[in-house]
A protein has these predicted regions:
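Short, flexible helix-loop junctions that flank or precede catalytic/ligand sites
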Residues: 1-347
Length: 347
């Protein structure tokens, strides 16, 4: 099998990832589990040539100099793939993350109705958080798509690499990739403030400078979507504040309390019928009560504020997990693995 055939096999079998690793057969991750493809082990030269052949000259140079490289790759009429090429103790390795060619809608993802309202905020910062592979990019792409279908504005994305490709519908869409189109997230965000955007998507808020610029963009009247790898709203607020030096923390809390509109923390669970995965969400909305807790550094009280805020669309992860179990979509065991209060989910 060549790389196109392997990727087509993965897409056909609903794989989220294809793993190539010298010394082992190709493997795919399906519904969270890594499975071997019934093929012989691959040699270093096989993996190396498969990956090397789909890189451009710039990517090859990075790969040769740093021994690893991130890039995106598209097979027309099949899908786009986010690729990480690396080296390991048996030789070359690579992981291809499948990015569906179609941007799914919020309805197709079965997102709560509040996600549409969040997408329609005129300004502020909206964060989608969770571990790697929890569907953050998919959720944010659906939210950007909702804006694109309902607004006449300018949506600007900064990604590393570009994942979902958006067509301009009602909105003007400009997508920039770190590397080919800009040297860094912070450079692109600095420029974004002069590019007349209504919505700015920041693929990853990795460092102090990027977080500072995202907060500034939100404060100056833009709607900013961003991602972090935190597992809850409270941890998200702490993570942002902790990035800044002690002398700035109080000011950042004040900025965050004014500009944070929502935090969606999500995780993916196997469905009870074994046919796929479903997202569970903690949803925090920046109500006056939440803003006060952020400003006064009472983040520990945030969980109970979310718990009692269902009338405005808030929910804890455990509340959502209980609902998924009640609706027979997820097993109690599967929900318990992700729950904060495991006693609420009997074996």
């Amino acid at each position: 099998m060549d790389i196109t055939e392997l990727l087509a096999f993965g897409v056909k079998n609903k794989a989220s990832d294809l793993h190539l690793s010298a010394g082992l057969p190709p493997m795919i991750r399906v519904h969270g589990d890594v499975r071997r493809i019934n093929l012989p082990a691959m040699e270093h030269k096989d993996v190396h040539s498969m990956v090397y052949d789909i890189m451009n000259d710039g990517q090859r140079k990075i790969y040769e100099e740093t021994l690893e490289c991130d890039f995106s790759f598209e097979i027309p009429n099949l899908a786009r793939f986010r690729v990480n090429a690396f080296n390991q103790h048996r030789g070359a390795g690579a992981v291809f993350r499948t990015i569906p060619s179609k941007v799914l809608t919020l309805e197709e993802l079965n997102c709560p109705k509040i996600f549409k309202d969040i997408s329609e905020f005129p300004r502020g910062i909206v964060l989608c958080t969770g571990p790697t592979g929890s569907g953050k990019s998919t959720t944010l792409a659906a939210m950007v798509n909702h804006v694109n279908e309902n607004d006449y504005g300018h949506n600007l994305t900064v990604e590393d690499p570009i994942e979902f490709v958006h067509e301009s519908k009602k909105c003007l869409i400009n997508q920039r990739e770190v590397g080919p189109h800009t040297l860094s997230f912070s450079n692109a965000l600095r420029s974004a403030l002069r590019e007349d955007p209504d919505v700015v998507l920041v693929g990853e808020m990795r460092d102090l400078e990027t977080i500072r610029l995202a907060l500034t963009a939100a404060e100056t009247g833009h709607l900013v979507f961003g991602t972090l790898h935190t597992s809850s709203a409270a941890k998200t607020v702490d993570r942002i504040v902790d990035v800044f030096p002690a002398a700035e923390k109080e000011m950042v809390r004040s900025m965050l309390s004014e500009s944070l509109r929502a935090v969606i923390s999500q995780t993916l669970l196997k469905t009870k019928d074994g046919t796929g995965r479903i997202a569970a969400h903690e949803i925090m909305i920046g109500t006056p009560a939440i803003r006060n807790l952020i400003r006064e550094n009472k983040v520990a009280q945030m969980y109970s504020a979310i718990q009692t805020g269902q009338n405005v669309g808030m929910q804890t992860l455990d509340q959502n997990l209980l609902d998924l179990v009640r609706r027979n979509l997820v097993s109690s065991n599967e929900a318990r693995n992700e729950a904060a209060n495991k006693d609420a989910f009997p074996g």
